[in-house]
């Protein structure tokens, strides 16, 4: 597999690549080496307005929202096939801009991205309305209709996969969308927007605006012509989108907010080796940058020493290295600020009682 890739860096509005209206750009950094990968077009408020307007026109006038379910299904299946054909390219982008191990990108993220689009495509002609019980002289129907224009706000930990989780149901039900990728990981989302056109998704159905949460994200959250916001990210930012909705048009807000879960091992656990396998996988996979990562380990005192010894040994199998190396299991964290936050949790100055079973690996 080639280790070179060309990056598209412009906004996608109405099926066209466009620079930001104010001419601003921001840098996407490779977290593995700190080098600039690309300068990405930064959307302004005017660009957000244009993207929403184009999405609104595409929704109201069709053809996507008015397309026969069987035809929409064909187009979405073709979209999945096009993404699949470019899986290596997208995997390279994600490894380079997010620091994700290339093996995970190829074997987990890209298949999940394709399968999500494909699953929702197959569901299109299997969605039925209902007839409710009523008087014989009355026909009472429950009809499901598309919502309209959806703003989809993506996180940086699974860029392509999260784009698919948003795009699948949004497109399958006839809506149009304005995608806002995380500023750390814009490149694969832009490319997916380009591939949508290749697959035959009509212009204006998928738009991509890049930039920062306090400007682009806020503009989408407050926009009066956005019917729904679908957000994945922090609880703090999720609350902001609820406020934006309350202060404007009461748009529907769908939140998937991050959280951390404890990994609990009871004293009567019979297979500690398997428990140690799961414990290491749950915290180290995807560098722990996962909303279901088990960042706390709650262990019964009677098995603590034995389990920790197993975990320390198994952690040695998690090779830290270049995300483009197929042998790497742990790449870099997304950015320096995030690394600093994680390292603060094991700061001996702040936690004087802390005893580390092994040395931190920071390069």
Q: Where are the language model's segments positioned?
A:
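Glycine-rich loop-to-alpha-helix module at the N-terminal edge of alpha/beta enzyme cores
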Residues: 37-127
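ALDH superfamily catalytic-core signature
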Residues: 228, 236-354
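Structural signal for hydrophobic packing residues in well-ordered secondary-structure cores
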Residues: 59, 63, 80-87, 91, ...
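Rossmann-like NAD(P) dinucleotide-binding subdomain of oxidoreductase/dehydrogenase enzymes
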Residues: 128-274
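Terminal low-complexity tails and localization/encapsulation signals of metabolic enzymes
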Residues: 1-40, 74, 78, 127-153, ...
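Single conserved hydrophobic/aromatic residue that forms the stacking wall/gate
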Residues: 351-363
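Hydrophobic packing residues within well-ordered alpha-helices of enzyme cores
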Residues: 117, 189-192, 220, 241, ...
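Residue-level signal for inorganic ion chemistry
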Residues: 34, 72, 94, 174, ...
